[in-house]
Design a protein with these regions (language model features):
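Short, cysteine-centered beta-strand-loop-beta hairpins and adjacent loop/turn segments enriched
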Residues: 79, 103-116, 148
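A solvent-exposed, acidic/Ser-Thr-rich amphipathic alpha-helical stretch
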Residues: 7, 19, 38-91, 99-104
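Hydrophobic alpha-helical segments typical of transmembrane helices
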Residues: 25, 37, 69, 122-124
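Short solvent-exposed loop/turn micro-motifs enriched in small/polar/acidic residues
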Residues: 24, 79-80, 118-121
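Short beta-strand edge/turn micro-motifs at domain boundaries
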Residues: 4, 117-149
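Short, low-complexity N-terminal intrinsically disordered segments enriched in polar/charged residues
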Residues: 1-47
Length: 149
């Protein structure tokens, strides 16, 4: 049986206006990320946003945490590029899948830089806060594998 949280998500009403608002905010977020605009990214997030990378235990909370997430990510992978491959937008938020290319030039998630040019697949869920009309963060799922020695 689904939890109350899941039932609430499934029962969220879907309107064209809400869909457009979510899509436009995602576009704003994506453009800010492409432009390395941290303030622009933060403008799309709730103050209590949470960022996670599945399977790593990594977690960043609030605007301070989101700033650290992006600073660390963009330092580790300064040439990171997301090529959108799939997207779903609904009243629960946005789910995207992207092919990511990047060079690993600094420490990321306890992994020292390798200098390797990487190609990986990411799926990212941006949960929507209908009251704030902002995203509540990102849940990142990736097939990134680091060398184990």
């Amino acid at each position: 049986m689904a939890s109350e949280r899941i039932l609430e998500l499934m029962r969220r009403p879907s309107t064209a206006e809400e869909h457009d608002a979510i899509r436009e905010l995602w576009k704003t977020h994506s453009k800010a990320e492409d432009n390395r605009d941290i303030a622009g990214l933060l403008s799309t997030l709730t103050r209590d946003c949470v960022y996670t990378v599945a399977g790593t235990g990594a977690r960043w909370e609030g605007h301070e945490g989101a700033t650290r997430f992006y600073t660390e990510l963009l330092t580790a992978f300064p040439d990171i590029h997301f090529e959108l491959d799939y997207i779903v937008i609904g009243p629960q938020g946005v789910c995207e899948e992207a092919i990511v290319t990047a060079t690993h030039e600094a420490r990321w998630l306890d992994h020292e830089p390798t200098g390797a040019k990487l190609t990986l697949r990411n799926a990212i869920f941006f949960p929507w806060d209908p009251e704030a009309r902002l995203f509540k963060g990102e849940m990142v799922y990736t097939d990134l594998q680091f060398p184990t020695g």
